[in-house]
Amino acid sequence: LVVGLITHDAGKTTVARALISELVSRGYRVGVAKPVAGHNIWYQPASVRNSIENHILVGEDAVVLKKTSGSEDPLEAINPLDIALAPLDPIHYLRSLRSYEDAMASMISSAIMLRISICIERGINTAHYIVYRRLERIPSGVRRVVEDIALKVYPRPIAIDAEALEPLILEGYIASETCYRAIANRHQVMVIESFNNSASPLARLENIDAVIAVSPGKILIYDGLTYLKALKVVLDVEGSIYRRWWPTTSEVLRLLSPLEIIDTPYIEDINLFGEFTENLTDKIISISKEAKA
C-alpha cells in the first residue's frame, strides 16, 4: 500500500511506478489498484486525453500504473471511482474572494464529473455523472473541455445536483471494494495506491504486507499488519459517527514507528534513483516474506 503524507504532490505515483517497474523486471506478476482517484481538468490535461481515448472518465495515475505493470485488468476495475475537478469562475465570487479560495480548495465544491464502476460476476457496471448546473460557474474554456469529455465517455453522464455529489462519492468509495476483490487474486503481487493523504483507499483493507508513506524527498516503510491495527484503533476510538471521511495518513502514523526511513533522490538523477528503486524493492520483498512466514 502506497499512501501520501501530504494531500497533493507527495509523490505516491512516482514511487509506486518505480516499485512496480522493478518488480516486473524481476519476473513478478504485478497487479495494480487505484481505487479512488481525483484529477483536475485544467491542471492535468493528460487526464482529458485519457478520458477521451478510453471513453471513460479516468485520470493519469491509473493509466500509468496499468501501463507500467502490464496488467490486463480493465481501467474501470483498477480505478472504480474517479472524480474530475474543474476551476470555478472567480467572476461569481468578486464580493467574497475568500469564498472562491475555499471553493477551489474543496473537492466537493469543485467536482464537475464523476464515474462509479461496480464489479459484478458478469462484468462491470459503470455510470458517469455531471454536476450540470456547475457548468455555468466554470470558465468557458474549461466548460468546452468538460462538454467534450461528456460527449466521448460511455455511458453518457447523468445530470445531478451538487447536493447529490457527496452521497454518490461515498457510495462509490464503498463500492470500489467490489473491483479490488475482483482483481486482487489474479496477481502474484498487488500494489495499491491511495488517494490524497487518505490512510486507506478502501473501506475494508486486509492482507497488506507493507505500507510505504511518501513525502517529497523521503519515504517511511511500515509493517502492514501493524498499520491495519493502528487504522482500526483510529476508527474505533473516534467512531464513524463523528467522521464523514476516512482517516488521514498522519492520524494513523502518529501511533506507529517506521521500520525503515529512506531518502528519495531527485528523479532526474537516474543512477541514484535506480539504486533507490532496487533498495526499496529489496526491502518490500523482505518484509512481505516475513509477513507470510
Residue spans for each PLM region:
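Hydrophobic positions on the alpha1 helix immediately C-terminal to the Walker A/P-loop
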Residues: 15
